Amino acid sequence: MLNSVIKRSALCRFKFTCLQVSECRPAQIEISKRLYSAKASGNGEYDLCVIGGGPGGYVAAIRGAQLGLKTICVEKRGTLGGTCLNVGCIPSKALLNNSHIYHTVKHDTKRRGIDVSGVSVNLSQMMKAKDDSVKSLTSGIEYLFKKNKVEYAKGTGSFIDPQTLSVKGIDGAADQTIKAKNFIIATGSEVKPFPGVTIDEKKIVSSTGALSLSEVPKKMTVLGGGIIGLEMGSVWSRLGAEVTVVEFLPAVGGPMDADISKALSRIISKQGIKFKTSTKLLSAKVNGDSVEVEIENMKNNKRETYQTDVLLVAIGRVPYTEGLGLDKLGISMDKSNRVIMDSEYRTNIPHIRVIGDATLGPMLAHKAEDEGIAAVEYIAKGQGHVNYNCIPAVMYTHPEVAWVGITEQKAKESGIKYRIGTFPFSANSRAKTNMDADGLVKVIVDAETDRLLGVHMIGPMAGELIGEATLALEYGASAEDVARVCHAHPTLSEATKEAMMAAWCGKSIHF
Ligand SMILES: Cc1cc2nc3c(=O)[nH]c(=O)nc-3n(C[C@H](O)[C@H](O)[C@H](O)COP(=O)(O)OP(=O)(O)OC[C@H]3O[C@@H](n4cnc5c(N)ncnc54)[C@H](O)[C@@H]3O)c2cc1C
Ligand SMILES: NC(=O)c1ccc[n+]([C@@H]2O[C@H](COP(=O)([O-])OP(=O)(O)OC[C@H]3O[C@@H](n4cnc5c(N)ncnc54)[C@H](O)[C@@H]3O)[C@@H](O)[C@H]2O)c1
């Protein structure tokens, strides 16, 4: 315990030297020098031009203006917020939430002592509620731009030369030419196509079409058992569709820990979604009112052809930089078309930086936002912070899946000596009283130091619970550190505490 306390206070001091303003004077002198050199010199010239108004771009623009940079943000969609707010995180979560409420009220009230009848879906109202949430959040960003004095150019940006961007106006906005001392490319990503399959957004849809279907399909096939496939598959399954997920790999859930993926398949299968893993799509074509799908099981080479009402293609996303003129400037990209950057988000043309889905790393909105803040802090102050070992991920199925840090497989591959602690939600009192106790928390710690390496969970509100684990990992905490923190009772967060106890001393209290 004493060791742990000493270790903890040493860590705190280390963090505070970086974070407490009063102790950062030398850095601040450097900051003002940098800010001066980042400032624009003439009229019509900007300190910062951000291309793309998604979570990466709009956050970078707001923070840039807050740090005193004359900032303009160029967006071609017509609304701010990018993929996330318009056709990603926000509309999907609105549908996930309301479809979950519908499903619970329809199928999970009797055992709770509530009698309901006549429950039905009003899909157009559910879509309207989703659209209203999107609208209020996207227009909120316009308000934040005004409040922070960020200029907003509605149009498509394309580099003329490394200092100049031409903007082709949309929605009646005039064309313009922007000169800036610094640029940030935040142009995001687009759907990865499946060769030979044409997305029409009606019968063969991407996530965008799957967010706006006008009726509940009887049968839906989802190609790809990753985050989009399982989130959107859950929405339509809860609303009544027969959903089959076709996944190339032997397991669903993409990069998540194998134990959690197993639990996820078990729980989601019970909800009625069918999985065809180790299976590849051979062809898909629209045939009248349905889609004819041909698949092959790669374990036994068995082929199957069947009709489905809707096919959702969700096999990943690829960076989007079309029409930006990056080739002309000679900006380096990797094999997957991600714009290459250094640790300060600079491309090989240093005053042009890149963040978010357009560059390396996980394609997540919070990662894009944090990079946006760090990139402008590098411009204005010469220092920024994103800890890539500590970016949480959440899958908003029910129950939710959330993780941060490394998986057990990764620990094995890296040759790290580790210990595991687990705790099931079925032994957590709040989960029991909520009658929603499927899932577990799994903690991976360094066997020698007890320091956290990864935390993985599937369970109720896992997306909220992962915040504590993320903070602990960021500050280099040990499992003992978290286990000794007082957690309120009865809360779901006690499951995290108990998994930490199991990892630290081999035993939890309630399991
Ligand atoms: C269905 C779905 C659900 C998702 N759910 C989540 C979630 O729950 N949590 C999460 O963390 N992530 C989620 N994501 C991922 C998340 O949306 C992205 O990681 C995030 O939007 C990336 O932000 P970004 O700013 O890099 O790019 P984007 O949000 O894609 O924004 C880029 C913007 O740049 C604009 N643009 C492109 N080229 C130009 C140009 N030449 N000129 C002007 N403008 C241009 C585009 O119009 C776009 O608005 C989801 C994605 C999808 C598809
Ligand atoms: N909650 C969230 O944070 C959230 C929600 C949605 C999307 N996103 C982000 O959007 C991005 C795209 O999501 P996604 O679900 O499309 O991608 P993904 O990478 O999460 O999953 C794609 C899945 O498709 C499978 N696959 C690939 N090719 C295939 C093929 N030919 N046949 C069958 N299966 C195939 C992969 O093995 C993988 O399981 C992700 O990077 C994700 O981070 C995040």
UniProtKB/Swiss-Prot annotation:
GO terms for molecular function: dihydrolipoyl dehydrogenase (NADH) activity; flavin adenine dinucleotide binding. It catalyses: N(6)-[(R)-dihydrolipoyl]-L-lysyl-[protein] + NAD(+) = N(6)-[(R)-lipoyl]-L-lysyl-[protein] + NADH + H(+). Transmembrane segments: none annotated. It is an enzyme of class 1 (oxidoreductase). NAD(+) binds at G224, G225, G226, I227, I228, G229, L230, E231, E247, L281, G316. The keyword Disulfide bond applies. SUPFAM superfamilies: FAD/NAD(P)-binding domain (SSF51905), FAD/NAD-linked reductases, dimerisation (C-terminal) domain (SSF55424). InterPro entries: Class-I_Pyr_Nuc-Dis_Oxidored, FAD/NAD-bd_sf, FAD/NAD-binding_dom, FAD/NAD-linked_Rdtase_dimer_sf, Lipoamide_DH, Pyr_nuc-diS_OxRdtase, Pyr_nucl-diS_OxRdtase_dimer, Pyr_OxRdtase_I_AS. It is found in: Mitochondrion matrix. Its main location: mitochondrion. Its EC number is 1.8.1.4. GO terms for cellular component: glycine cleavage complex; mitochondrial matrix; mitochondrion; oxoglutarate dehydrogenase complex; pyruvate dehydrogenase complex. One of its GO terms (biological process) is pyruvate metabolic process. Keywords: Disulfide bond, FAD, Flavoprotein, Mitochondrion, NAD, Oxidoreductase, Redox-active center, Transit peptide. It comes from the Eukaryota. FAD binds at residues 75-84, 93, 157, 187-189, 357, 363-366. Disulfide bonds join C84-C89. Its cofactor is FAD. Binds 1 FAD per subunit. Pfam families: Pyr_redox_2 (PF07992), Pyr_redox_dim (PF02852). PANTHER family: DIHYDROLIPOYL DEHYDROGENASE, MITOCHONDRIAL, DISULFIDE OXIDOREDUCTASE. Homodimer. Belongs to the class-I pyridine nucleotide-disulfide oxidoreductase family. The active site is a redox-active disulfide bond. Lipoamide dehydrogenase is a component of the alpha-ketoacid dehydrogenase complexes. Malfunction of this protein blocks the progression of cell cycle from G1 to S phase. This is Dihydrolipoyl dehydrogenase, mitochondrial.
